[in-house]
């Protein structure tokens, strides 16, 4: 097998020749199995039971986004008012989920839906969904200045 001296010189030059050097540290792997077992033990202490026939779950956030769980596992302990949702959430906009979430919307989210419908009818792209919230919502909250107590602010 013939050896090309140019390629050999190039490879030797590219190879890092270090004697001694620093040790390459292995990255610590965060194991979630331990966290999962702790969670399972905590739910076991609360006597949580698996809730069947839950196909999906949606959590509406204050910023107008929705955490959507397509396949979700739900465990609940009604006595301690504790419920655990397990699965992989996807962050989506309300506009992406409108056909699926109409039956799930409560009274607090109907205002957001109305604003969204108005924006779509006006031909505008949906902007921030909470933009229509009352701007003066903090009228009764006084501004604090450094060194003052909240009771003394007029």
Swiss-Prot record:
Please provide the Gene Ontology terms (biological process) for this protein: protein transport
Report the CDD domains cross-referenced here. NAC_BTF3
Question: Whose protein is this, by species?
Answer: Scheffersomyces stipitis (strain ATCC 58785 / CBS 6054 / NBRC 10063 / NRRL Y-11545)
Name of this protein: Nascent polypeptide-associated complex subunit beta
Assembly mode: Part of the nascent polypeptide-associated complex (NAC), consisting of EGD2 and EGD1. NAC associates with ribosomes via EGD1.
Give the family from UniProt. Belongs to the NAC-beta family.
Q: Start and end of every NAC-A/B domain?
A: 33-98
Q: Where in the cell is it found?
A: Cytoplasm; Nucleus
Where is the region Disordered? 125-154
């Amino acid at each position: 097998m013939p050896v090309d001296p140019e390629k050999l010189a190039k490879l030797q030059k590219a190879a890092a020749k270090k004697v001694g050097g620093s040790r390459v540290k292995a990255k610590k792997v965060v194991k979630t199995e331990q966290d999962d077992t702790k969670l399972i033990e905590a739910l076991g202490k609360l006597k949580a039971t698996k809730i069947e026939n839950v196909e999906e779950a949606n959590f509406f956030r204050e910023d107008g986004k929705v955490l959507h769980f397509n396949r979700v596992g739900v465990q609940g302990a009604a006595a301690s008012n504790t419920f655990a949702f397990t699965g992989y959430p996807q962050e989506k906009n309300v506009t992406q989920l409108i056909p699926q979430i109409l039956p799930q919307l409560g009274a607090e989210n109907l205002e957001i839906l109305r604003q969204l419908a108005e924006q779509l009818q006006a031909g505008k792209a949906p902007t921030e969904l909470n933009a229509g919230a009352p701007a003066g919502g903090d009228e009764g909250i006084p501004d604090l200045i450094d060194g003052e107590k909240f009771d003394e602010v007029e």
